[in-house]
């Protein structure tokens, strides 16, 4: 099933990690990433928590070389993307992996930019901290990142709401888990906590905002 076929389907979830928004549409963070990449000459980009590759494909189309990584195996979808676009592994490559293992996967490789949409909240806070520290050493220009916010609909009945962020990693109530198609435990963020995490891991926050849905987005360098 190619990207146009996927985008014509209802919102889908793969592996209980929420719906794959990127195969349906671009949001404001996706669009800012694409505009940023258009000014570059074949930038090397990481797409972390790529899902079925909606944004990965768009980034290749504007000239980027993309390495997409997701814990769910989207190898078949990415093989189709490569065939449909007549792209090589250098243009678009997919790896199935848990992001906690990213340092082992990438070793000393460097990338120009990285995108991590709707993904960081699936890691406990200490692992999120470690990942962002590693990315600061690996990404030479900008990080475009979003998380599910405490003020989102997901956070309304979130049982970890009053826990310190270091211990805030819990599953949603069964009804909410089914509604949002999120079966994995999550660490939801308040805006000030998200900003603090980015800064303490070495990132300069150029812009940060809360979406109409209560999710948090940032552009960092």
What positions do the PLM features span?
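Class I (Rossmann-like) S-adenosyl-L-methionine-dependent methyltransferase catalytic domain
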Residues: 1-43, 51-104, 143-221
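Class I SAM-dependent methyltransferase core
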Residues: 47
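A conserved beta-strand element that flanks and buttresses the S-adenosyl-L-methionine
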Residues: 115
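Short catalytic micro-motifs in class I SAM-dependent methyltransferases
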Residues: 118-119
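A short glycine-rich, Lys/Arg-flanked "PGG" loop and its adjoining helix->strand segment in the class I
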Residues: 129-141
């Amino acid at each position: 099933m190619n990207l146009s076929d996927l985008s014509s389907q209802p919102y889908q979830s793969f592996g209980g990690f929420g719906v794959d928004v990127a195969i349906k549409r671009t949001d404001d963070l996706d669009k800012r990433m694409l505009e940023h990449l258009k000014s570059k000459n074949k930038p090397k980009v990481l797409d972390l928590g790529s899902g079925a590759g909606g944004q990965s494909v768009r980034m290749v189309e504007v000239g980027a070389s993309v390495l997409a990584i997701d814990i769910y195996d989207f190898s078949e979808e990415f093989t189709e993307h490569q065939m449909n676009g007549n792209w090589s592994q250098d243009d678009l490559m997919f790896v199935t992996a848990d992001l906690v293992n990213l340092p082992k996967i990438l070793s000393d490789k460097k990338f120009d930019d990285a995108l991590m949409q709707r993904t960081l909240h699936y890691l406990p806070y200490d692992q999120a901290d470690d990942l962002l520290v590693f990315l600061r050493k690996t990404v030479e220009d900008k990080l475009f990142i979003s998380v599910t916010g405490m003020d989102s609909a997901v956070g309304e009945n979130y049982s970890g709401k009053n826990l310190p962020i270091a211990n805030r990693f819990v599953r949603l109530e069964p009804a909410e888990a089914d509604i949002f198609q999120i079966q994995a435990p999550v660490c939801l963020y308040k805006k000030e906590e998200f900003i603090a995490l980015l800064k303490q891991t070495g990132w300069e926050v150029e812009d940060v905002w809360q979406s109409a849905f209560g999710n948090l987005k940032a552009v960092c360098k």
